[in-house]
């Protein structure tokens, strides 16, 4: 009988919710008698029905919620099914062997399981012809882990997981479940407390703030972006002009944000009209708080359900790719929120965060910092990045707050941080993680770009890992952004005293590969919108917007502009309302957008503005000494080719010069390509005069141009 097969101590552990290996008590138990026994644990039930070889049987109540049915020898897990309390008829979860393998453990615990998203969390799968969901969790401090959901009435004793190893892997395959099932983890901590957590590896969640995960299938979508993906893998250099977007506040319809599928069509059409090559999405990983803009993440493997399902997000990506628009995702591996339902003290003890409070809690954001010394934690983060690239076809990751990851003292006072093993302030583990991240991405996903939002002078951010660098493709040039705004916020009368703010960034422009960002960070928290930062009346402010954005386009570095900046949004950005699109009914806003579209088109079609732009060869000063008139001029070359160039002239004062002479030697021909003061862009119409080559005894030494107020003029120049 069952008495001989189940030790009372094991049964007590099962009933009390502390049994780490429920499979040794449940499922098919072989005996020395003529029969084997199917054992089911159903706490609170009065009867359990079992379908055996097509016939209905009622199991015998044993004790403490345990039921058994004697069956002939040779019965396997495929020969019977169990009626669950919710009416589901499915195979027995406790009749299956372990599915998490030794190679999984080996790779995961050394931080190199690059497809961990296919093995951890809730994975729809088929085992020996039987469909179900494999639930796997890492919780090394837990006494018991159960999966709870609608399917078991959220009862933590019904579906306890089996502990696979001493390193804290728990597993259970539950037949009969599928996509859309709601679930959470119920965990018994070392101290005996029962806590309920959402799934760190969850791929879909109910709308915030519930945090309830849903089983989602990331494999079923039929992609049609093969041409894009093939072309991306072969592209080594090209123009990158990025439209930074917060999906929840770009456009609304009937008082709500657009869905992923609605957004796909409108955003792709808009980006094509405006000649953007990429969109960068503020984090769409699941997050509980709208006001965090997505930067406090609880679901690192899930697109937020605010705008639709996982498959609808895949459609969003697919459609933009078909329209030749790349997608960059803001990704936050530096810190996570303290919300009790998510990663914080996940199994009752610090797990994803540092153990020491001073190092764990980040003073800037009141969030936890990841413990990069744990291989399982870095594998979790690495898996998240690779998931978005593999299953979601994302084209780039912009890593947020890199400086906070690089330094142990970031945002902390003396005594609030501990030095590394060498006594320094660098966070050696996170530096190694970033190198590992970039190495794997560039090896596994050719053509994918990585961007670092890094605000310090840390050396080698965009240097190759094998040369001692971090391995990013590009670094945000926050110094350029700060200096540029410092200059442009000055009255044009006083800008001559601040010319160095324009020229300083060019002295270090080629030490890294840079992005020139005009980002969301500059239009929030009382900073005002871009156009309202600028002095003067309406015409003057919009003229300065045109010269600001053309200045960004012409300099070496990839380009990024936050939504609304392209048409002169007046109000400061808020994540809780859409942009003021009705402004496009007004002349200045409409013509500014025309100018931005023309600038982007010029940038894309002129290799002078993007070819080999991380090399000093692409740039040559013509004049940066005309401080009195607030004029700078320079050539942009297409690599080492010196037969032609773009001549970019920026005029930052309100004066007009009908005849302005630049020292440009050897010019054969000069053609005006773009003038931001053109009337079609809202300008005064000055500056369109054909340039005149100045000669002395047949030798070309300069150019005589008409220089409009607060404007950029761009010429195509050929040389003798």
Curated annotation (Swiss-Prot):
Transmembrane segments: none annotated. Pathway: Glycan biosynthesis; glycogen biosynthesis. Its EC number is 2.4.1.18. The active site is at residues 400, 453. It catalyses: Transfers a segment of a (1->4)-alpha-D-glucan chain to a primary hydroxy group in a similar glucan chain. Monomer. This is 1,4-alpha-glucan branching enzyme GlgB. It comes from Chlamydia pneumoniae.
């Amino acid at each position: 009988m069952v008495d001989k097969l189940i030790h009372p101590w094991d049964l007590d552990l099962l009933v009390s919710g502390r049994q780490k290996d429920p499979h040794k008590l449940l499922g098919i138990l072989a005996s020395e008698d003529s029969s084997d026994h199917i054992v089911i644990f159903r706490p609170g039930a009065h009867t359990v029905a079992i379908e055996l070889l097509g016939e209905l049987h009622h199991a015998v109540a044993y004790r403490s919620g345990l039921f058994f049915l004697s069956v002939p020898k040779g019965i396997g897990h495929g020969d019977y099914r169990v009626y669950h309390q919710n009416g589901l008829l499915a195979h027995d979860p406790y009749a299956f062997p372990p599915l998490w393998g030794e190679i999984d453990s080996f790779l995961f615990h050394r931080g190199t399981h690059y497809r961990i998203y296919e093995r951890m969390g809730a994975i729809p799968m088929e085992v020996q012809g039987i469909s179900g969901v494999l639930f796997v969790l890492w919780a090394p401090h837990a006494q018991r882990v159960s999966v709870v959901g609608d399917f078991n009435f959220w009862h933590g004793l019904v579906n306890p997981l089996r502990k696979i190893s001493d390193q804290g892997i728990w597993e259970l395959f539950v037949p009969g479940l599928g996509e859309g099932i709601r679930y959470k983890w119920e965990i018994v901590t070392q101290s005996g407390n029962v806590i309920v957590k959402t799934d760190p590896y969850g791929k879909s969640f109910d709308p915030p703030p519930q945090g309830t995960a849903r089983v989602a299938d990331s494999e079923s979508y039929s992609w049609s972006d093969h041409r894009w993906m093939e072309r991306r893998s072969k592209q080594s250099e090209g123009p990158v002009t990025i439209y930074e977007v917060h999906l929840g506040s770009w456009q609304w319809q009937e008082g709500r944000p657009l869905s992923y599928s609605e957004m796909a069509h409108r955003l792709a059409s808009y980006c094509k009209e405006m000649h953007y090559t990429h969109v960068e999405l503020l984090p769409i990983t699941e997050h509980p708080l709208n006001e965090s803009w997505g930067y406090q993440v609880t679901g690192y493997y899930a697109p937020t359900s605010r705008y639709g399902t996982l498959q609808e997000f895949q459609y969003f990506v697919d459609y933009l790719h078909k329209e030749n628009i790349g997608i960059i995702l803001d990704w936050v591996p530096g810190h996570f929120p303290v919300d009790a339902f998510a990663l914080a003290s996940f199994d009752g003890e610090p797990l994803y965060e540092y153990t020491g409070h001073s190092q764990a809690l980040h003073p800037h954001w009141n969030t936890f910092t990841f413990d990069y010394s744990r291989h399982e934690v870095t594998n979790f983060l690495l898996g998240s990045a690779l998931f978005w690239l593999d299953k979601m076809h994302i084209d780039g990751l912009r890593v947020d707050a890199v400086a906070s990851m690089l330094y142990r003292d970031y945002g902390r006072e003396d005594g609030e941080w501990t030095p590394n093993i060498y006594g320094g302030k660098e966070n050696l583990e996170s530096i190694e993680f970033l190198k590992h991240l970039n190495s794997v991405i560039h090896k596994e996903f050719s053509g994918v770009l990585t961007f670092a939002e890094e605000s310090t002078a840390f050396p080698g951010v965009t240097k190759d890992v094998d040369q001692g660098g971090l391995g990013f493709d590009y670094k945000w040039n926050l110094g350029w952004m700060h200096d540029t705004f410092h200059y442009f916020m000055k009255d044009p009368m006083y800008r001559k005293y601040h010319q160095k703010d324009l020229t300083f960034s060019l002295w270090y422009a080629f030490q890294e590969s840079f992005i020139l960002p005009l980002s969301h960070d500059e239009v929030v928290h009382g900073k005002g919108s871009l156009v309202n930062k600028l002095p003067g009346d309406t015409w003057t402010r919009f003229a300065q917007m045109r010269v600001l954005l053309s200045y960004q386009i012409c300099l070496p570095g990839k380009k990024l502009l936050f939504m609304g900046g392209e048409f002169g949004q007046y109000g400061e950005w808020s994540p809780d309302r859409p942009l003021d699109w009705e402004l496009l009914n007004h002349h200045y806003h409409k013509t500014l957008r025309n100018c931005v579209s023309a600038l982007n088109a010029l940038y894309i079609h002129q290799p002078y503005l993007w070819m080999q732009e991380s090399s000093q060869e692409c740039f040559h000063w013509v004049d940066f000494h005309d401080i009195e008139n607030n004029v700078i001029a320079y050539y942009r070359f297409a690599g080492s080719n010196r037969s032609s160039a773009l001549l970019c002239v920026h005029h930052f004062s309100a004066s007009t010069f009908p005849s302005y002479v630049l020292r440009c030697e050897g010019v054969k021909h000069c053609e005006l390509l773009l003038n931001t003061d053109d009337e079609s862009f809202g300008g005064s119409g000055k500056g369109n005069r054909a340039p005149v080559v100045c000669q002395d005894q047949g030798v070309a030494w300069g150019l005589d141009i008409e220089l409009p107020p607060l404007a950029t003029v761009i010429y195509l120049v050929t040389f003798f």
